[in-house]
Amino acid sequence: METLKNKFREKATALNAEIKDMLAKHGNLKLGEYTIEQIYSGMKGVIGLITETSKLDPIEGIRFRGFSIPELREKLPKAKGSNEPLPEGLFYLLLIGEIPTDEDVKNITIDWQRRSNVPKHVFDVIDELPLNAHPMTQFVTGIMAMQTESEFAKAYSRGISKKEYWEYVYEDTMNLIARVPRVAAYVYRRKYKNNQHIEPNYNLDWAANFAHMLGYSDPNFQNLMRLYLTIHADHEGGNVSAHTTHLVGSALSDPYLSLASGLNGLAGPLHGLANQEVIKWIFQLKENLGGGLPTKEQIAEYIKKTLAEGKVVPGYGHAVLRKTDPRFTAQQEFYRNYIKHDDICEIVQMIYEVAPPILEATGKIKNPWPNVDAHSGALLVHYGMFEYEYYTVLFGVSRALGVLASLVWDRALGMPIERPSSVTTEWIKNYIAKQITEKAK
């Protein structure tokens, strides 16, 4: 699809010139200071990356190219008869920085359909894994097996100029995004549906076709996938999956290797695995409180009991956010618009009403509000997806949109290999002693 590629070329050329001028005039300007505590606490708040696609505000939440989630739900093109945005439109926005037209989105859908064939050896490699392998293990294995198809790796081996890197990364990105739903659906049907696979339906958009290949025909589940794959796509550049994809890509590893690395980070319990932990915790809560619909008072006591046992309330808190995650709110609205009543979703709502003041009262939690994971599992369960381990694969399909759009920008802007400095605790101690001595003089 040369129109999109040419439009990106124009945007990248203009931004490169702007950055070159900015560095010449203001390259020595300091952005701020950081503390020893920040180094020991995951570099939280330390500005160290450039990510063009999105920015996370502690109060407002994520903004994709300046647009909030409510704005995107209103402005992005939608499938006929749907009120939810098409992920193809979000990808266009992340890559180009503009709201696409219906025609722009239709062209991306057609292009991804054209690119979506997955080589047989990819499925053969997945089939060599034991059925009890975690879905993320199978998913990432499939992506690694597809690396044989990397246009960037082939071009780099032939010898290309640095200015050409982004063009081949773009091709890999478009191919990868087209194919990851097929690999993800294959893993789901292999592990949970007795290897009864479903061929793609090219009359459907990217998200609806993914729902179809998973085996879900309910139009509202298709709508859920459109929303889910849109709101999970990007969360600025410092989270583990985005940063890892960027970091590995900075070594000029191709997009297949880079995405697989990022998804391995997403599989961690502190990142993308959290959504399955939330729904498991809610079912434990429900069972311990008698199996029916509990009261707010019962939920409050269960939360206090959870905290007293030294455990966390999954789905609450965020490294950056200090208010309710707008992605949580978007899923709340989906529930009200499409479902009306569901016991698990009602429990999610009651937890939302009682948990924040309890968490805040502990004095240990900076953000007592729900994040995106607090609601997503409940919606999936409503439509019959009880396979909690698989939820992170859905997250991974979505996150590919954001991290790969960023990877194209990384190569277009000529970003160098990432190589920060590191020090030892002994070095820190000596630095502190030196500062104390200097102040005493």
Give short role names for the model-derived ranges.
Residues 1-441:
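Hydrophobic alpha-helical bundle cores within soluble ligand-binding/oligomerization subdomains
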